[in-house]
Amino acid sequence: MMLSRDLRAEAAVRLWIMFLLLEDLLGACAVGDYQRRVPSAPNTDIRNTLEKPRVTTQEVAGPHTLRYDLMALSLKLPELPQVLIWRYFDDEPFLHYNESSNRTDSWEPRIKRHWRAMTWARETEDLQEMVEQLKRMLAEVTGQKGQDKGLHILQATLGCELQRNGSTRGFWHLGYDGRNLLTFDQKTLTWTMDMPFTQQKKTFWEPRAPRADLVKTFLDDTCPAQLQRHLASLRSEPLDTGSPMVIVTFRNYPLGRVTLTCRAFNLYPHMATRGTLAWLQDRKLVKQKAFEPGTILPSGDRTYQIWVSIWVLPGQEPQFTCNLSYHGGNIEKRAVIVNTVSGEKTRQPSTSGVGGRVKKSLWTTMTTAFMVTSWTRKTGGDSTLLLLWWLLFFSTVLAVLTLV
């Protein structure tokens, strides 16, 4: 059944009124959400607040790992050296040894600068001993009767880990042709087979493994000393990856609010544990988020990054500044919007914040009152007039909530 013209018009007006009411309701919720998430902060001396050092147990005690990966080939190939050694600190490569050139080199420039010639000679000598040990074992294995004279590969993974409580744990694994072979047990000081074996295989391999007393000395003394030496070199000289960077990004939401995100990159370990990233509004601390374990993210190059976000109202962005305070420096980045089309920096209109919301709420109420009053005069609808008074009441409540 078709509605009359008057009923259709009244239904359209009611739908339009409900749309305006819903729009105001969502806007008021957004403001309330903003006020809950970004509370006002007292007038605090920013230097005293941001420069308090925070030291984590991870910075002092670890865990940290020093690991060697060794590979020896039974045949000399023109494309590859017969023996290769890589050394890893916390699973990142930083030192390698090439038997063809008989030299040790580092992928980290600061290791080259910090270590003296005597240190390099000692490191090279230690690696050469590992090379000779690996080559002897491979020669004994391939020299046995019945062994295939083709290409064989002997691999070893060994090292130590510094625990959080200051204790160390060692490990030594051997592999042959890509399969796990033997593992050293530090408690019993014996080698155990890692794969299904017969007594003949056990008798063949275990006597040819490195001597237990030499392995124990390396895992208990040599490796922990090397790990501590490397940790000392890391603490004495900062990473050479450039200065920290601070980037501010924006994200607009349809409910009348903007998310400001501040990201800090290129943070050295001592910066990440003793620095603070915070938002300032008109030079006053708004929301502070200190660097804590669990919030620091590794970047993959031994530096770290962190971010902090707040919600603001459209037009308030120029009032906010992101502040990165760390030992040795201070970086500030203003929240200036970049026009993605022209690349020019712009600012939001000055009408914003609570005043803007109140203005919009009052405008909606007045417009609604005018339209519905005009319609009720033509139709004489008492029900529509009653709806008007309810809408005026709710709009007034929303305006008051916006001011709170």
Swiss-Prot record:
<keyword id="KW-1015">Disulfide bond</keyword>
<feature type="glycosylation site" description="N-linked (GlcNAc...) asparagine">
    <location>
        <position position="323"/>
    </location>
</feature>
<dbReference type="InterPro" id="IPR011162">
    <property type="entry name" value="MHC_I/II-like_Ag-recog"/>
</dbReference>
<dbReference type="InterPro" id="IPR003597">
    <property type="entry name" value="Ig_C1-set"/>
</dbReference>
<feature type="lipid moiety-binding region" description="GPI-anchor amidated serine">
    <location>
        <position position="374"/>
    </location>
</feature>
<dbReference type="InterPro" id="IPR050208">
    <property type="entry name" value="MHC_class-I_related"/>
</dbReference>
<dbReference type="GO" id="GO:0001913">
    <property type="term" value="P:T cell mediated cytotoxicity"/>
</dbReference>
<dbReference type="InterPro" id="IPR036179">
    <property type="entry name" value="Ig-like_dom_sf"/>
</dbReference>
<keyword id="KW-0336">GPI-anchor</keyword>
<feature type="region of interest" description="Connecting peptide">
    <location>
        <begin position="343"/>
        <end position="373"/>
    </location>
</feature>
<dbReference type="Pfam" id="PF00129">
    <property type="entry name" value="MHC_I"/>
</dbReference>
<feature type="propeptide" description="Removed in mature form">
    <location>
        <begin position="375"/>
        <end position="404"/>
    </location>
</feature>
<keyword id="KW-1003">Cell membrane</keyword>
<dbReference type="GO" id="GO:0005615">
    <property type="term" value="C:extracellular space"/>
</dbReference>
<dbReference type="GO" id="GO:0048018">
    <property type="term" value="F:receptor ligand activity"/>
</dbReference>
<dbReference type="InterPro" id="IPR007110">
    <property type="entry name" value="Ig-like_dom"/>
</dbReference>
<dbReference type="GO" id="GO:0042742">
    <property type="term" value="P:defense response to bacterium"/>
</dbReference>
<feature type="signal peptide">
    <location>
        <begin position="1"/>
        <end position="30"/>
    </location>
</feature>
<dbReference type="GO" id="GO:0006974">
    <property type="term" value="P:DNA damage response"/>
</dbReference>
<feature type="glycosylation site" description="N-linked (GlcNAc...) asparagine">
    <location>
        <position position="98"/>
    </location>
</feature>
<dbReference type="GO" id="GO:0009408">
    <property type="term" value="P:response to heat"/>
</dbReference>
<keyword id="KW-0449">Lipoprotein</keyword>
<dbReference type="GO" id="GO:0009986">
    <property type="term" value="C:cell surface"/>
</dbReference>
<dbReference type="GO" id="GO:0051607">
    <property type="term" value="P:defense response to virus"/>
</dbReference>
<dbReference type="GO" id="GO:0002418">
    <property type="term" value="P:immune response to tumor cell"/>
</dbReference>
<dbReference type="GO" id="GO:0045953">
    <property type="term" value="P:negative regulation of natural killer cell mediated cytotoxicity"/>
</dbReference>
<comment type="subunit">
    <text>Heterodimer with B2M.</text>
</comment>
<dbReference type="GO" id="GO:0005886">
    <property type="term" value="C:plasma membrane"/>
</dbReference>
<feature type="region of interest" description="Alpha-3">
    <location>
        <begin position="243"/>
        <end position="342"/>
    </location>
</feature>
<dbReference type="InterPro" id="IPR011161">
    <property type="entry name" value="MHC_I-like_Ag-recog"/>
</dbReference>
<protein>
    <recommendedName>
        <fullName>MHC class I-like protein MILL1</fullName>
    </recommendedName>
</protein>
<dbReference type="GO" id="GO:0046703">
    <property type="term" value="F:natural killer cell lectin-like receptor binding"/>
</dbReference>
<feature type="region of interest" description="Alpha-2">
    <location>
        <begin position="151"/>
        <end position="242"/>
    </location>
</feature>
<feature type="disulfide bond">
    <location>
        <begin position="160"/>
        <end position="223"/>
    </location>
</feature>
<feature type="region of interest" description="Alpha-1">
    <location>
        <begin position="59"/>
        <end position="150"/>
    </location>
</feature>
<dbReference type="GO" id="GO:0032815">
    <property type="term" value="P:negative regulation of natural killer cell activation"/>
</dbReference>
<dbReference type="GO" id="GO:0009897">
    <property type="term" value="C:external side of plasma membrane"/>
</dbReference>
<dbReference type="GO" id="GO:0046629">
    <property type="term" value="P:gamma-delta T cell activation"/>
</dbReference>
<keyword id="KW-0325">Glycoprotein</keyword>
<comment type="similarity">
    <text>Belongs to the MHC class I family.</text>
</comment>
<feature type="glycosylation site" description="N-linked (GlcNAc...) asparagine">
    <location>
        <position position="165"/>
    </location>
</feature>
<dbReference type="GO" id="GO:0006955">
    <property type="term" value="P:immune response"/>
</dbReference>
